[in-house]
UniProtKB/Swiss-Prot annotation:
Keywords: Cell membrane, Disulfide bond, G-protein coupled receptor, Glycoprotein, Membrane, Receptor, Transducer, Transmembrane, Transmembrane helix. The gene is Htr1f. Residues 50-59, 120-139, 203-291, 351-366 are cytoplasmic. One of its GO terms (molecular function) is Gi/o-coupled serotonin receptor activity. Residues 1-24, 82-96, 160-178, 316-327 are extracellular. Glycans are attached at residues 5, 10. Disulfide bonds join 96-172. This is 5-hydroxytryptamine receptor 1F.
Length: 366
């Protein structure tokens, strides 16, 4: 979210010329990422707005996440590109304050949205009946408002401490000399949400797996009951079971309670039902793997994109002798920004309704 800076004043014209190709490459690469992030998040927002089928409280959270990531792409990334390429801040301290404020608030808000979505999905799968009544547009709006308010409260202290010291006009950074402020902001913006997300998605996976198994067992029991036929005549009873027809003949006799004769006969119908049951088990297993893959992508992308940056933020503050290069600092910041590009892909690519909505938008069928 913040960058170190350098100056080109001590470089010769030849050195500047030699560095020009790399600067152009960096500029084009980062501009491409910013454009892709803007486009994809715009598609998600437009799809939810124009597609009636997507007007669901759960998707309102995804829409709000897309808006947040869109703001990162439009208001944060372009200034960062200029800062990296120029290697100094040339837009004044007022604009610097605005940029840092938007940067920290939007990135924090994007992360907290992931926590809100995880909480929403957890309650939807573990308390489906009760939560279905509470899962209204108003409820989604309250969750979104809470996320934004918390983001502002988490982001303000670092900006406040920035003005307690002196800063150069050609730099735009958050100082790493207030350990309390850094711990407060990093734990509030990342580490606490990370723990919450890990716990929630672990519980979601376990709950989803249990639900799949219960549904499969319920289907098998239902098939057994539907396939049973009872015929009674006086003291005789015949029981036919579709899975493997069993003939049970019970006769009353003074010397014995009953005599049983068992014979098993395979039938085409029983084999057909067995085949259907096997297919359902296969489908259930496929869905379980798909759910695990989706959760793995969500968690993996989040951790890979943001963990290195926030580890750096803590290490640089706690360890006075620990230094990090400008290039590495920029790379870690943009690795975090990359999460704003990945979010809309992960949260919509596995949803058929979103896929159809995207196709209609691209083909201009609205």
């Amino acid at each position: 979210m913040d960058f170190l800076n350098a100056s080109d004043q001590n470089l010769t014209s030849e050195e500047l010329l030699n560095r020009m190709p790399s600067k152009i490459l960096v500029s084009l690469t980062l501009s491409g990422l910013a454009l892709m992030t803007t486009t994809i998040n715009s598609l998600v927002i437009a799809a939810i707005i124009v597609t009636r089928k997507l007007h669901h409280p759960a998707n309102y959270l995804i829409c709000s996440l897309a808006v947040t990531d869109f703001l990162v792409a439009v208001l944060v990334m372009p200034f960062s590109i200029v800062y990296i390429v120029r290697e100094s801040w040339i837009m004044g301290q007022v604009l610097c304050d605005i940029w840092l404020s938007v940067d920290i608030i939007c990135c924090t808000c994007s992360i907290l949205h992931l926590s809100a979505i995880a909480l929403d999905r957890y309650r939807a799968i573990t308390d489906a009946v009760e939560y279905a009544r509470k899962r209204t547009p108003r409820h989604a709006g309250i969750m979104i408002t809470i996320v934004w308010v918390i983001s502002v409260f988490i982001s303000m202290p670092p900006l406040f401490w920035r003005h307690q010291g002196t800063s150069r006009d050609d730099e735009c950074v958050i100082k790493h000399d207030h350990i309390v402020s850094t711990i407060y902001s990093t734990f509030g913006a990342f580490y606490i949400p990370l723990v919450l997300i890990l716990i929630l998605y672990y519980k979601i996976y376990r709950a989803a797996r249990t639900l799949y198994h219960k549904r499969q067992a319920s289907r098998m029991i239902k098939e057994e009951l539907n396939g049973q036929v009872f015929l009674e005549s006086g003291e005789k009873s015949i029981k036919l079971v579709s899975t493997s027809y069993m003939l049970e003949k019970s006769l009353s006799d003074p010397s014995t309670d009953f005599d049983r004769i068992h014979s098993t006969v395979k039938s085409p119908r029983s084999e057909l039902k067995h085949e259907k049951s096997w297919r359902r088990q296969k489908i259930s297993g496929t869905r379980e793997r798909k759910a695990a893959t989706t959760l793995g992508l969500i968690l993996g992308a989040f951790v890979i994109c943001w963990l290195p940056f926030f580890v750096k933020e803590l290490v640089v503050n706690v360890c006075e002798k620990c230094k990090i290069s400008e290039e590495m600092s920029n790379f870690l910041a943009w690795l975090g920004y990359l999460n704003s590009l990945i979010n809309p892909l992960i949260y919509t690519i596995f949803n058929e309704d979103f896929k159809k909505a995207f196709q209609k938008l691209v083909r201009c069928r609205y």
